[in-house]
Structure formats: C-alpha cells, structure tokens
From Swiss-Prot:
This is NCK-interacting protein with SH3 domain. Residues 200-215 have a biased composition (Low complexity). It comes from Mus musculus (Mouse). It holds the Pfam family SH3_1. Residues 1-58 form the SH3 domain. GO terms for biological process: positive regulation of neuron projection development; regulation of postsynapse assembly.
Length: 714
C-alpha cells in the first residue's frame, strides 16, 4: 500500500492523476519510472510515477479492501459492456487476484510468526507476485477498466475470485509507458558523498542491476508549487518522461550492501519549516488516525437486528422466523465472502440473536408494524361488538370487513413475533381476548365463527396465561353448547373440538358453573361420536378429535369417584372403538393432548385416563380379554425399559398397581415372572432421586397389598 506525497497531473495518455494523500495499490512495477497502480478509494487503475509515492506498513486489511474494490470495478465495467471482458481487463483481473493471494498468504505468515515484515521483504514478495503471473509476461495496453461480476468469479480458494477464461497472446516485456514529449535530465539523487545526475527519459534498468524498492521510496524529492499538498515538500520532482532513446543506468550495488541515501536538503528544510496546519494534515493521513476513524465508523447500533427484521417482514410478508433465517443467511454469506466486513456482520448477527422482542428492541420512537395493526384490529372488533346495531339486519353488511380483520389477525398471530402478540393479548388483563370471546358468543355467522376459532387456537399457542384466561371465560361453555346443537357443519364441529381440547390441554381447574354444559351428557355425546361417528364425517377426523377432547377434559378431573367422564364410560354399553384407540395410543407412547410446550407440563393424558379407568372395576371391564393382555404387555415392557428417575416409570407403576387391584390379574398372572423381576430390580436400585424413591414406595405398597407379587418363583 502506497500513499501519494504530492499531487500529480499529467497530459500523458494512460497516466493517472491524483491528489496528495491518496492511497494506491501497486499492481505491477512496469519500469523504473512508471508503476501500474489501483486507486484504493475507487479501484481505478492507471500508471503513476513511483517518485510521488511513499510506502505504508502494516495495512494488509486496507490492501485487501483496495484489491476487492478494484476487482469489483473491473467486473462492473464489463457488465456495462454486455458482460464481455477485454484482454486488458483480463490482465488486470489476473494481477489483482494474484496480488490478493500473495497478500493473504503474507498476512497468514505474519500472524503465525508474530513478526513484522520489513519493507525489503514486502517488496520481495510483491516482485515475486509480479514475476509469478500465470502467463509469465506483462500485459500490454492500458488497464483502466475494472470491478467485480457477481458469482461467476467467486472461488473456493483463499483468493475468493476466479479469472474468467482468456486466450493467450504475446505481449512485450515492458508495458506501454506514457507517450514521449521531450528528453529531460530531471532526477537528482542526494547521497552522502555528493549528487549524481540520472537521466529520466524513461530509462530501463538492466536485468543484472536494479534499484531496490526501499531506496526507490526515498529516491525522489521536491514538489511543484502549483500542486503542493499541505503535508508535502515545496518542490516535487519533475514528471518522468520516456525519451526517444533508452539509456541504460549504471550498475548499482545491491540494497543490502549500499548505504541508504540521505534525504535531500530541500526536503529536510521543508519538513523543518512545516506549519502547524501541515502537521495536522500529516496526522490526518497517518495510519493510526485512519484506523481510529474506521473503527468509529463501523460501530453497529444494537437495534440493527430488530430494524432488519421489521423491514424484511413488512416488505416481504415472511413469518418472523423465516425473516430471521433469511437475514442470517444473507449476513452470513456477506461475512464469508467479504472478509473485511466480518466484524460488522458479526455484530449484526449478534444483534439479530439478541433482539427477541421487536416491540422493545426497535429504536426509541419506533413501533412494530404488527403491534400497530393488532391495536387497530382489536379496537375495531371491540367497537363492533359494542355497536348497538349489531343485533339488527344491518349487521350482515359488515361481514366482508370483519372477515378481512379476522384473516389479518390470524395471519399476525401465526407469523408475527410471538412476544409482540403475547404483549398485545395480555394488555389490560386480557381485555382484547375476552372481547373476542364475547364477540364469538354474539356472532352467529358460521364463516366468522370459524375464523374466530382459528384465532383462539393461535392465541393458545402463544402463552399458558392466555389458555388460563380462556378456561375461565364463557368460551368452553359456548363451544360445548354449539357442538351439541349444531352437528351439521362438519368443519366448525372439528374446529370446535380442536380448540376446546387446546383450552383443556393444560389440566387447569374448570369453574364449577361450567359443569352444567361439560358434565356427563357432554361426555356421552363425545363417546357416541367416537363409537358411531356422524354421517357427514367422510374424512373420519371427528372421532379422533373427540377422543383427544375426552383425554384433555379428563386432565382437570382429579377425583375418580366424581369423574363425569368415568360415569359416562360406565353407562355406555359399547366402547370397543374407544378402548382400541386408547390402547393404540398407549402402545405408541403418544400424548395427543400435549400440543404446546407451555410450563408447567400436565400429566400424560393417556396414562392419567387409564389410571382413572382402572380405579374402579366398573370401568375396568370396558376392555376385552385380548386387549387386556396387550395392555399388560405394554405396561410391563415400559416399566422394565424406562430408566431410573424417569417420571413416566412412576406413572406406569401406578397404572400396573391399579390393574392388579381392579382386575383378576392374580388369576391369569400374565407376564407375572417378568413383572416380579422388574419390581425386585427397582427395589435394589441405589439412586436417591425423588422419582426413584417414589418408585420404591409404589413397589413396596404393591408387595404389601398383594404378597403374591413378592414371591420368588420356584
């Protein structure tokens, strides 16, 4: 990386004008007096005089950024020309990519050895990068076009780019220098022993003796008064010209043996007489100040993740989780593809992970769009509920408007940030949720009721507190009444059973007044649907939904002797299909009622139901003999297979205890030896966890009540 000490402007073709302080990336040292360079700021390429440049150390990251900008400039120019690359553009790309590889390798070597590369070493690598070009020769023509075409040039190696295929062609050993004006002897070397004049007419250095790049950086002094920069010497060197005759310079000793020339007296005087403004300008160009400015500019606000989520969701309609995935994929790809942006992209990813709640993660003053829409929808639906005309014929004129509101509400509850939805539902002691329940009770149009049921189901998935509110509301009573009175609408009947199972899925206590509609008659109605079905139920979904509803409804009934479902079960003459479905669920180990992951988790609904069934001999008789044997097989196997400390093992032990107590198990003794061996193993377990202690207590109680279980088989 080089910085311009002086401003430069020339009428020569292919020469690049620049101001003092600009930084460059040297691509090729074409000759002693002209280097092919790329402007670090824009990626523009052209020939510059090395006498005007000063080498900067320890800026590999800036070099990589400059290379990437130059590559991008070449590709963009080619895209504007129809996607075709000229030979000159291919040559520039080749040099840029090779230089990038060398820079990455040098940075890796420097990091591993923890040493700083000296200027001579850096120059050696730069020269080696030039000498190891794939075509082995320097390209001719002015390589001014630049920048990056998208993915076709992304590679898998460290360079990340791949040069498009190009035909080989012969090239002169020296690049085309600026056109000759006149010969001049202009460059003066100020050494410790005196002055030596060197012809500047584009003389080429012989292969046997070339000046080192270290001495080249300090070789020329002076500046033109008309183009003098604030931190530059008053007299820059004259512009190098290519003369009509090429002059071979005299052999010079190698850089390691020759002493470095002293700085010219003019430059020393200029540095001594520098004004405070000049010193401030020099400080502004220092690498340390540049790095500090860059660090200050790359501070990523902590709200960037939430802002991106809001923008993507609002403009694409993707769900909250898909928005997070999309942003993470894009930011991660940028981080991997553009290494210079890695620190910034990492902060963006962290902000994306930390910003869980959009309503609080957004900058102060900004409100989440979904939150705004929920406020509008809840307020308008509440207004329509309280409308004095809602019981008149005019109510039916607003069906389309209400349907649009409910569809948008369902979309937001399903796809928006769950934290935002929970916040809006819990506002003012669940006022909005209770208003929707009251509106459902008043609304008789089937299409709107169906949308309301879907919204209630989406609300149940948000938080357990919303389920508690719905259990205590009039919704369960209204759903039970609606299911028994309107059995013709199959779709609404299915959704009513599903939502009611969701409401009862947490096993919370139901208000006593609800049993007027949720008592034994309702349980018998559900059992009849499971056993006999309904004529319009061609998909056979309704029996399974009613089965799940019975299991969920049984969760909050703690006393078996007062269990309305067990009472209905004992009165039902035939529950063959119900018992088979129950046995199938037990064999699978599934709990169809555990729909959500809310805490605290309720008991296993299938095991709880079977324990209540075998709490009485009247209900235990619903199983046929073969089904009973299969149930014992499953229970004994689960007790033997489950690990110590597993809560389910205690549930299966309690079930087996109830089976032995309420059925003639000791008469047929099915799988008795396996059961005895498992019970003995449980008693000898040394685990001290509360679950293991409870398991041992159940086994001891079984031995005490049924001594035959403790007998050692002969």
């Amino acid at each position: 990386m080089y910085r311009a000490l002086y401003a430069f402007r020339s009428a020569e073709p292919n020469a690049m004008a620049f101001a003092a302080g600009e930084t460059f990336l040297v691509l090729e040292r074409s000759s002693t007096h002209w280097w092919l360079a790329a402007r670090a700021r824009s990626g523009e390429t052209g020939y510059v005089p090395p006498a005007y440049l000063h080498r900067l150390q320890g800026m590999e990251q800036d070099v990589l950024q400059a290379i990437d900008r130059a590559i991008e400039a070449v590709h963009n120019t080619a895209m504007r020309d129809g996607g075709k690359y000229s030979l000159e553009q291919r040559g520039v790309l080749q040099k840029l990519i090779h230089h990038r590889k060398e820079t990455l390798s040098r940075r890796g070597t420097s990091a591993s050895s923890a040493t700083v590369m000296t200027p001579s070493t850096s120059d050696h690598h730069l020269d080696a990068a030039v000498s190891r070009q794939p075509n082995g020769v320097c390209r001719t023509g002015f390589e001014r076009q630049h920048s990056l075409p998208s993915s076709e040039h992304l590679g898998t190696d460290g360079a990340l780019y791949q040069v498009p295929p190009q035909p080989r062609r012969a090239a002169p050993t020296t690049p085309p220098p600026p056109v000759k004006r006149r010969d001049r002897e202009a460059l003066v070397i100020s050494g410790s022993g005196g002055r030596t004049a060197i012809p500047s007419g584009g003389s080429s250095v012989s292969s046997g003796s070339s000046a080192s790049s270290t001495s080249m950086d300090t070789l020329y002094t002076g500046s033109s008064p008309s183009e003098l920069g604030p931190s530059c010497s008053p007299t820059p060197p004259p512009v190098p010209r290519r003369g009509a005759h090429t002059t071979v310079s005299q052999p010079q000793p190698s850089p390691s043996k020759a002493p470095s020339p002293e700085p010219p007296t003019e430059e020393v005087a200029a540095e001594t007489n520098s004004t405070p403004d000049d010193l401030e300008a020099q400080d502004a160009l220092s690498p340390e100040t540049t790095e500090e400015k860059a660090a200050a500019e790359t501070v990523v606000p902590r709200t960037i993740g939430a802002e991106l989520m809001e923008l993507v969701r609002r403009n694409t309609g993707l769900s909250h989780e898909l928005c997070r995935v999309a942003i993470g994929v894009v930011v991660g790809h940028i981080q991997a593809t553009v290494p210079a942006s890695s620190p910034i992209m990492e902060q963006v990813l962290l902000s994306l992970v930390e910003g869980k709640d959009l309503s609080t993660a957004l900058p102060s003053g900004q409100v989440c769009h979904d939150q705004q829409r929920l406020e509008v929808i809840f307020a308008d639906l509440a207004r329509r509920k309280d409308d004095a005309q809602q019981r008149s014929w005019a109510l039916y004129e607003d069906e389309d408007v209400i349907r649009c509101y409910l569809e948008e509400l369902l979309h937001i509850l399903t796809d928006a940030d769950p934290e935002v939805c929970k916040k809006m539902c819990k506002r003012s002691d669940f006022e909005s949720v209770l208003a929707l329940v009251a509106y459902y009770q008043m609304e008789h149009r089937a299409s709107l009721r169906l949308l309301l049921l879907k919204c209630f189901g989406a609300m149940c998935s948000l938080d357990a507190a919303i389920i508690s509110t719905l259990v205590s509301s009039v919704l369960p009573v209204e759903l039970a009444r609606d299911m028994q009175t309107d059995t013709q609408d199959h779709q609404k009947l299915c959704y009513s059973a599903l939502v009611l199972a969701m409401v009862f899925s947490m096993g919370e206590a139901v208000p006593y007044a609800h049993y007027e509609h949720l008592g034994t008659p309702f349980a018998q109605f559900l059992l009849s649907i499971v056993e006999d079905g309904l004529p319009m139920d061609t998909t056979e979904q309704l029996p399974d939904l009613c089965m799940n509803l019975l299991l969920a409804l049984n969760l909050h009934l703690t006393a078996p002797e007062q269990n309305v479902i067990m009472a209905a079960l004992s009165r039902h003459t035939n529950v063959k299909i119900f018992s088979e479905k129950l046995l199938l669920l037990l064999n699978r180990g599934d709990d169809p009622v555990r729909i959500f992951r809310h805490e605290p988790q309720p008991p296993h609904s299938v095991l709880k139901f079977l324990q209540d069934v075998f709490s009485s001999s009247a209900t235990a008789a619903i199983f046929y003999h073969t089904d009973m044997m299969a149930l014992i097989d499953i229970t004994v196997r689960q007790i033997a297979d489950l690990s110590p400390g597993d809560k389910l093992r205690m549930e299966y032990l309690s079930l087996m205890h109830a089976v032995v107590r309420s059925t003639p198990y000791l008469q047929h003794r099915h799988r008795l030896s396996d059961l005895q061996a498992t019970l003995r193993r449980i008693l000898t377990e040394e685990e001290a966890s509360p679950q293991c202690q409870m398991d041992r207590m159940i086994v001891q109680e079984m031995y005490k009540e049924f001594p035959d279980l403790g007998e050692v088989p002969s």
